[in-house]
């Protein structure tokens, strides 16, 4: 049977107020339609309409937490792919408890985080206290625990870092695309969360979703590399940011195939 790729999927986002505009823009640039809704009566309709759901816990507030839980449960019930971006889950008990609750009751399709955030979710100790993780080394022991975690919960885990690691417990991949400058732009991790939600929503076939997720991670890194290459003398981080969004809007499969640095395990 021929597999058709969904065009312009609708993505429902419940996200933080720091990067909300950037998430909307990258969603459009990558071929999706963003819609932000948090009112309880409205989101019960919006989530059911959507092709994908993103919940980002960057700025937690009581009403938003309730909205996130309602939408996650709807997505679970309707079979809509969902992503939990576990921003700063290592920082407070509130975040840890909420993330664990939404994973248990909402059963997201994918969990994204940096190494410190993912280590916290799998029960390992992390020394990081902010959005940036300085724990760049992913040990084999931790990698195996992440694989077990993903397999037990039937989800994909994306660990962002110098080398990104993606696994569903059965398949795993490492992605070496990207540039250090991406870590200096507020929200590049959140923007990746939007791309991952789109990646899941492009296909209804679960078998295709893992490779599409890996492609999204690699694509984002390649856009960073291209954005850096475009910089001229005396152009700094803000020019880099706009170059990054620019590259996402014009990148194509030929460029991705030429530049991707992906190792499947």
Curated annotation (Swiss-Prot):
The keyword Nucleotide-binding applies. It catalyses: 5-(2-hydroxyethyl)-4-methylthiazole + ATP = 4-methyl-5-(2-phosphooxyethyl)-thiazole + ADP + H(+). Keywords: ATP-binding, Kinase, Magnesium, Metal-binding, Nucleotide-binding, Thiamine biosynthesis, Transferase. GO terms for biological process: thiamine biosynthetic process; thiamine diphosphate biosynthetic process. Disulfide bonds: none annotated. CDD domains: THZ_kinase. Gene3D superfamilies: 3.40.1190.20. ATP binds at residues 112, 160. Substrate binds at residues 36, 187. Pathway: Cofactor biosynthesis; thiamine diphosphate biosynthesis; 4-methyl-5-(2-phosphoethyl)-thiazole from 5-(2-hydroxyethyl)-4-methylthiazole: step 1/1. One of its GO terms (molecular function) is ATP binding. Transmembrane segments: none annotated. Its cofactor is Mg(2+). The keyword Signal does not apply. Pfam families: HK. Its EC number is 2.7.1.50. Belongs to the Thz kinase family. Catalyzes the phosphorylation of the hydroxyl group of 4-methyl-5-beta-hydroxyethylthiazole (THZ). This is Hydroxyethylthiazole kinase. It comes from Clostridium perfringens (strain SM101 / Type A). The gene is thiM.
